[in-house]
UniProtKB/Swiss-Prot annotation:
Binding annotation for D-glyceraldehyde 3-phosphate: 156-158, 187, 216-217, 239
Metabolic or biological pathway, per its Swiss-Prot or TrEMBL entry: Carbohydrate degradation; glycolysis; pyruvate from D-glyceraldehyde 3-phosphate: step 1/5
Subunit details: Homotetramer.
Molecular functions per Gene Ontology: glyceraldehyde-3-phosphate dehydrogenase (NAD+) (phosphorylating) activity; NAD binding; NADP binding
Species assigned in the record: Brugia malayi (Filarial nematode worm)
Cited CDD domains: GAPDH_I_C (cd18126), GAPDH_I_N (cd05214)
Enzyme class: oxidoreductase
GO annotations of cellular component type: cytosol
Enzyme Commission number(s) from the entry: 1.2.1.12
InterPro entries xrefs: GlycerAld/Erythrose_P_DH (IPR020831), GlycerAld_3-P_DH_AS (IPR020830), GlycerAld_3-P_DH_cat (IPR020829), GlycerAld_3-P_DH_NAD(P)-bd (IPR020828), Glyceraldehyde-3-P_DH_1 (IPR006424), NAD(P)-bd_dom_sf (IPR036291)
Name of the protein described by the UniProt record: Glyceraldehyde-3-phosphate dehydrogenase
């Protein structure tokens, strides 16, 4: 079977790392990139050098109006466009059937469907969506309906971390209710120094100077991908001055009491079985930078978890909110292409 042909709209943090993941995994063929604000020479530079993930381990160049990206094993010849209107991007001409919508702007079904006018067959939004169906690999991807799901969402990086863990715990022990906190790395929407920020004044404070309490819909979104948890989870974020890697703290009440050893055994079994590659299990004394570049959605930290009693537990899981998530975008494309 030929590799799915992919277009990327928006060459920001996620757009560039989806391309890196695509080259590394060699399961999809990226044939086009669109970004109205970045010309091709600047794309070469931004893809080659990355302050968080280091230099690209391969070569990238601009030749004849195309990005040529290779890691020695596979070469991607990528058409470059600079259109502001998604409907005007000629995905069909480039052969891009699957479009990654990673601008952060076109996150509704209506807005993202503009890509279909240019010849795309499916659109994968790399963010939560108000109305597009959300799929989390390892959790509910089997609910994908090829005939009807043309605009889909890969949910958020935090939902991708929380949902696999919540599924394992809920399936085995039953979650009555839970609160999630993500200690989350800085992202591009934050300010380097204090500045204006609409109604959410705290969000406008300097990212490098503060721990900033913030909202997140990640926990509630788990209820959309695991219907049995709908209305049982909510959460918040604390934004911290680190460039990448975040950590989820899920504090929940269990229906069926369990020792921490029983919980660890259940997670380890899933990590080595049905969720291999999605969920990871560690018994090492790790810190955040140990997971920069980790491709898993969720890494369960067995040493950091605690319980008050068999029915009330705090569970900890790490995630590279950039690269782990970008790998799932590529995996989701591979999955829907195989249906």
């Amino acid at each position: 079977m030929s590799k799915p042909k992919v277009g990327i709209n928006g060459f920001g943090r996620i757009g560039r790392l989806v391309l890196r993941a695509a080259v590394e995994k060699d399961t999809v063929d990226v044939v086009a990139v669109n970004d109205p604000f970045i010309n091709i020479d600047y794309m070469v530079y931004m893809f080659k050098y990355d302050s968080t993930h280091g230099r690209f381990k391969g070569s990238v160049s601009a030749e004849g109006g195309k990005l040529i990206v290779t890691n020695g094993k596979t070469t991607h010849h990528i058409s470059v466009h600079n259109s502001k209107d998604p409907a005007e991007i000629p995905w069909g001409v480039d052969g891009a059937e699957y479009v990654v919508e990673s601008t952060g702007v076109f996150t509704t079904t209506d807005k993202a469907s503009a890509h279909l006018k240019g010849g795309a067959k499916k659109v994968i939004i790399s963010a939560p969506s108000a109305d597009a169906p959300m799929f989390v690999m390892g959790v509910n991807n089997d609910m994908y309906d090829k005939a009807n799901n043309h605009i889909i969402s890969n949910a958020s990086c935090t939902t991708n971390c929380l949902a696999p863990l919540a599924k394992v715990i809920h399936d085995k022990f039953g979650i009555i209710e839970g609160l999630m906190t993500t200690v989350h790395a800085t992202t591009a929407t934050q300010k380097t120094v204090d500045g204006p920020s609409g109604k959410l004044w705290r969000d406008g404070r300097g990212a490098g100077q503060n721990i900033i309490p913030a909202s997140t819909g990640a926990a509630k979104a788990v209820g959309k991908v695991i219907p049995g948890l709908n209305g049982k989870l909510t959460g918040m974020a604390n934004r911290v001055p680190t460039p990448d890697v975040s950590v989820v703290d899920l504090t929940c009440r269990l229906q069926k009491g369990a020792t921490m050893d029983e919980i660890k055994a259940a997670v380890k079994e899933a990590a080595n079985g049905p969720m291999k590659g999605i969920l990871e299990y560690t018994e090492d004394q790790v810190v955040s930078t140990d997971f920069t570049g980790d491709t898993h959605s969720s890494i369960f930290d067995s040493l950091a978890c605690i319980s008050l009693n068999p029915n009330f537990v705090k569970l900890i899981a790490w995630y590279d909110n950039e690269y782990g998530y970008s790998n799932r975008v590529v995996d989701l494309i591979s999955y829907i292409a195989s249906r």
